[in-house]
Amino acid sequence: MTVNIYDNANEMASVLKETEQYTAWQNAFNAIQADEEAKQLFTKFQSVQVAVQQMMQSQQQPSADQEKEWDAIAADVQKNELITALLSTEQALNTLLTEINDIVTKPVADAYAKLRQK
């Protein structure tokens, strides 16, 4: 019997959409999409995250003005209940995805564990 692992992966993607974690995340995401202020703030927050990540990768330090701007955006994000709900549900969804990844990659992890034991 031939197994098409991609069929299984696509089925898992469909099943994922039925989980409590995904449903909660989707609802939180939709709430932000429906609120223009939250949507703009979240977009700005994502831009800041990318900028910070790029600076870290290139080992640059942000200017004092950049730090002030980023801190202000982070403070606004923490005050916005729609965004904090999205971030919370995203964390729960990521936990589930990490657990699934651990299950899927267990044969590889077990093989390396056996290699270390010898």
Curated annotation (Swiss-Prot):
SUPFAM superfamilies: YheA/YmcA-like. InterPro entries: Com_YlbF, YheA/YmcA-like_dom_sf. Pfam families: Com_YlbF. Belongs to the UPF0342 family. This is UPF0342 protein LCK_01004.
